[in-house]
A protein has these predicted regions:
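Flavin (primarily FAD) cofactor-binding/catalytic cores of flavoenzymes
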Residues: 1-190
Length: 190
C-alpha cells in the first residue's frame, strides 16, 4: 500500500529511495526537500577519504570553520535527493502535523490512503537521567573534549566533542587519547 516517510536525513532519503523504486505505490515524503546531497564516491575515493585528506574531520569546533560547519545543515551523502523527489510516485507533502485513524494531516492537505509509516527523524539524546549533568540546548552533555562537569564521568563518540570527526570511527581516536591522558593525570594527582 501507500507509504509515508517522515524525515529528511540520510536514513530518510535512503528508505525513500528503496521503497519508491516500486512505482505501483505512492510514497509521501515529509521532510526537507531543499537539503544538499554529496556523492558517496568522488574521483575513485570515498567522500570520507577526501574529508580525511583535506582535514575536514579535524577542524576544532572552536575554530571559525568548525563553527561554520557545525551551524550548517548537514548534506545527505550518497543518495540522489533530486532524482528521488522527481519520481512520479513520490509526493512531497511538507511537515506532518497529526494523524487520526486512517487520516494523516500535513501542512496543506490530508491523506487517507497511507498504510505504512516509516519514522526516520534521527536520533535524539537522552541524558536527563544522569543527576547533576549539565546539558546543552540540544540535550547533549556539556563537555570539553569528553570531560563533563561531574568528576569521573567522561563521554566519547558524541558529535562535535572536539572535531567534526569526533562521532566517527576514524576521528574518535584523538578524543580517546585526550581522555586517557586526562584520566591518567587525575589518577596520578589523587
Amino acid at each position: 500500500g501507500d507509504a509515508l516517510v517522515v524525515g529528511g536525513g540520510d536514513s530518510g532519503y535512503q528508505i525513500l529511495n528503496e521503497i519508491s523504486k516500486d512505482a505501483s505505490r505512492t510514497v509521501y515524503f515529509s521532510g526537507d526537500t531543499t537539503v544538499k546531497s554529496l556523492p558517496q564516491n568522488f574521483l575513485g575515493k570515498t567522500l570520507w577519504w577526501w574529508f580525511t585528506v583535506v582535514g575536514f574531520l579535524s577542524y576544532s569546533k572552536y575554530s571559525w570553520i568548525g563553527k561554520k560547519i557545525n551551524s550548517s545543515t548537514q548534506p545527505v551523502i550518497g543518495t540522489d535527493v533530486k532524482g528521488i523527489l522527481t519520481r512520479e510516485n513520490v509526493i512531497a507533502v511538507g511537515r506532518t502535523k497529526d494523524a487520526l485513524n486512517n487520516d494523516v494531516f500535513f501542512e496543506k492537505q490530508k491523506v487517507s490512503t497511507i498504510k505504512n509509516v516509516i519514522w526516520a527523524t534521527g536520533y535524539r539524546p537522552n541524558f536527563n537521567w544522569i543527576q547533576g549533568l549539565e546539558l546543552d540546548a540540544n540535550g547533549y552533555p556539556k563537555n570539553y573534549r569528553g570531560v563533563s562537569n561531574i568528576d569521573g564521568l567522561y563521554f566519547i563518540g558524541l558529535p562535535w566533542m572536539y572535531t567534526r570527526g569526533s562521532a566517527t570511527l576514524g576521528g574518535v581516536s584523538k578524543d580517546a587519547s585526550y581522555l586517557a591522558n586526562v584520566m591518567v593525570t587525575k589518577d596520578n594527582i589523587k
